């Protein structure tokens, strides 16, 4: 039996309580292998957000595409998408695969 592969498209939370870090922990707990596409980096702790830096949408799109090209992704979970409205949607990227 192979391990199912999923991808999370989300922000990075330095306190690991949310964002792609939490998604990685949840996927692991459910027996899945998780890939990531980082949309932004957030400086935060519970109850405090000090800064958000978006990742260039073209780089986010490239992360999604390369994961879809090289791994048998069976599910995609989205979180904080930041400025992804300026690039193709994850659904459009899946169609172009």
Cite the ranges covered by each PLM segment.
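Small-residue (G/A/S/T)-rich helix-start motifs and N-terminal tracts that mark the onset
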Residues: 1-75
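Anionic group-transfer/hydrolysis microenvironments
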Residues: 10, 79-81, 91
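Hydrophobic alpha-helical segments, especially transmembrane helices
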Residues: 26, 78, 92-95
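Glycine/small-residue-rich loop that forms an oxyanion/phosphate-binding "nest" at active or ligand-binding sites
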Residues: 73-87
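Single conserved hydrophobic/aromatic residue that forms the stacking wall/gate
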Residues: 85-97
């Amino acid at each position: 039996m192979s391990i199912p592969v999923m991808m999370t498209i989300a922000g990075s939370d330095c306190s690991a309580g949310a964002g792609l870090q939490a998604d990685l922990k949840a996927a692991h707990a459910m027996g899945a292998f998780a890939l990531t596409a980082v949309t932004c980096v957030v400086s935060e702790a519970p109850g405090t957000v000090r800064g958000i830096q978006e990742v260039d949408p073209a780089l986010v799109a490239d992360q999604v595409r390369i994961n879809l090209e090289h791994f048998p992704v069976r599910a995609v979970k989205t979180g904080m998408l930041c400025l992804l409205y300026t690039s193709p949607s994850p659904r459009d990227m899946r169609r172009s695969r």
